[in-house]
């Protein structure tokens, strides 16, 4: 019978990868909650219209990458390709704006895009992100960027660069859009097929061209910063000022526009040179118009998302691996029940314990304990059982001592 395998573009997270995933998730939870963010979980599928209106019908995500299907009720359903639109829907549907002036949320979950699978980019991938609703202050933009940078730094990831830009408002982008089209139309013959298609439909994405972006006529394109209105320019300048206060170094990148249409004002990416062409580790920005587009509510918002798989590729070997604190080695028929009671007693005191229920010799037990990288091994043989003691071996000091069973917890804690 043919073995059924995981679908192309998906993968199991097991072994060391699973340990990395748990570590990243735990660091995110602790850090985000320290900043006052609350966890929220949204469904992995939504009405297709949410993403068409939220992300933008002219984006690559909506045009080429969404997993969309009809359910048995003939409704068009899409597996979420990103989570911001879903969080906006959740925020509006549950009228959270009526309960609190400012809302801070974070999330962690699977997203789905039909892309060519490659290192760090799968068709099912995991994202961690956060969003702030109800606050327009540039201080919040700077805080969100700072949290993203410090999160990656906390994970031990180095060689990071923060890139920032402003894409203005719909009004200022309209003026800039015309100047951009005018500039690129004189270079149509030298542009890639995607850019020729985008020039009238989504001209800002021309700045993000991965094929010809290094050519001189791309580099000489007008900068959106020169077309920002006075209040938009002040907001951008204030974001930079508060980034300085947060101690975050940054580079201004006038070609940075992000790939989703809902962004306005501040946009940013955190990049590294360690991932080749997939250099962006984390990205986000402000999307003050999205809540009006999806729910007719004039509520500002800002946030970011990061791909967990890409972070996993960057993690060094010195991350905490969630290994058991204690391995229990029991020897002989009469010791297993007592060993089990010892294990439960330790677990009740928040001590991580591994116990193997199959009979083994001492050599096999030691080999297993070494592989699990536990600090302690509790050895319970027939002699120890009869005396009411155990042998406690500390692998970090190589010391071994006899202790009473009821005193194990005091020695280990």
Curated annotation (Swiss-Prot):
A single GO molecular function term of this UniProt record: histidine-tRNA ligase activity
Catalytic function, reaction form: tRNA(His) + L-histidine + ATP = L-histidyl-tRNA(His) + AMP + diphosphate + H(+)
UniProt EC number: 6.1.1.21
Keyword Protein biosynthesis: yes
Broad enzyme group: ligase
SUPFAM superfamilies to which the protein is assigned, alphabetical: Class II aaRS ABD-related, Class II aaRS and biotin synthetases
Keywords: Aminoacyl-tRNA synthetase, ATP-binding, Cytoplasm, Ligase, Nucleotide-binding, Protein biosynthesis
Localization of this protein: Cytoplasm
A biological-process GO annotation: histidyl-tRNA aminoacylation
InterPro entries: aa-tRNA-synth_II (IPR006195), aa-tRNA-synth_II/BPL/LPL (IPR045864), Anticodon-bd (IPR004154), Anticodon-bd_dom_sf (IPR036621), His-tRNA-ligase (IPR015807), HisRS-like_core (IPR041715), HisRS/HisZ (IPR004516), HisRS_anticodon (IPR033656)
Gene Ontology cellular component terms for the protein in this record: cytoplasm
UniProt main location, coarse: cytoplasm
Top-level taxon in the UniProt lineage: Bacteria
Complex and partners: Homodimer.
PANTHER family cross-referenced by the UniProt entry: HISTIDINE--TRNA LIGASE, MITOCHONDRIAL-RELATED (PTHR43707:SF1), HISTIDYL-TRNA SYNTHETASE (PTHR43707)
Family: Belongs to the class-II aminoacyl-tRNA synthetase family.
Protein name listed in UniProt: Histidine--tRNA ligase
Organism: Fusobacterium nucleatum subsp. nucleatum (strain ATCC 25586 / DSM 15643 / BCRC 10681 / CIP 101130 / JCM 8532 / KCTC 2640 / LMG 13131 / VPI 4355)
């Amino acid at each position: 019978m043919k073995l059924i395998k995981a679908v192309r573009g998906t993968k199991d997270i097991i072994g060391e990868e699973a340990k990395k995933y748990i570590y990243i998730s735990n660091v995110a939870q602790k850090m985000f909650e320290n900043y006052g963010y609350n966890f929220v979980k949204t469904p992995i599928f939504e009405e297709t219209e949410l993403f068409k209106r939220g992300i933008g019908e002219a984006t690559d995500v909506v045009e080429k990458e969404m997993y969309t299907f009809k359910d048995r009720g003939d409704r068009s359903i899409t597996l979420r390709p990103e989570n911001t639109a879903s969080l906006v829907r959740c925020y509006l549907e549950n009228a959270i704006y009526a309960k609190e002036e400012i809302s801070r949320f974070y999330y962690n979950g699977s997203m789905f895009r039909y892309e060519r699978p490659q290192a760090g980019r799968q068709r099912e991938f995991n994202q961690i992100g956060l969003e702030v609703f109800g606050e327009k202050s540039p201080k919040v933009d700077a805080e969100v960027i700072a949290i993203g940078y410090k999160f990656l730094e906390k994970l031990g990831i180095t060689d990071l660069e923060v890139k920032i830009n402003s894409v203005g408002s719909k009004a200022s982008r309209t003026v800039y859009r015309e100047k951009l089209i005018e500039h690129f139309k004189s270079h149509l013959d030298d542009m890639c097929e995607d850019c020729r298609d985008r020039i009238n439909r989504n001209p800002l994405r021309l700045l993000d061209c991965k094929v010809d972006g290094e050519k001189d006529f791309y580099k000489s394109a007008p900068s959106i910063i020169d077309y920002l209105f006075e209040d938009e320019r002040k907001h951008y300048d204030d974001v930079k000022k508060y980034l300085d206060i947060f101690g975050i170094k940054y580079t201004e990148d006038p070609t940075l526009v992000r790939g989703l249409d809902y962004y306005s004002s501040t946009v940013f990416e955190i990049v590294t040179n360690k991932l080749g062409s997939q250099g962006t580790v984390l990205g986000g920005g402000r999307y003050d118009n999205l809540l009006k587009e999806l729910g007719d509510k004039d509520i500002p918002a800002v946030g970011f998302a990061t791909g967990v798989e890409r972070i996993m590729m960057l993690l060094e070997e010195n991350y905490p691996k969630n290994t058991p604190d204690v391995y229990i080695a029991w020897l002989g028929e009469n010791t297993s029940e007592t060993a089990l009671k010892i294990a439960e007693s330790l677990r009740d005191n928040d001590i991580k314990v591994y116990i193997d229920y199959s009979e083994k010799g001492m050599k096999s037990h030691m080999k297993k304990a070494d592989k699990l990288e536990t600090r302690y091994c509790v050895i319970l043989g027939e002699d120890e059982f009869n005396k009411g003691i155990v042998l406690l071996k500390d692998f970090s000091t190589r010391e071994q001592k006899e202790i009473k069973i009821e005193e194990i917890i005091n020695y280990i804690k």
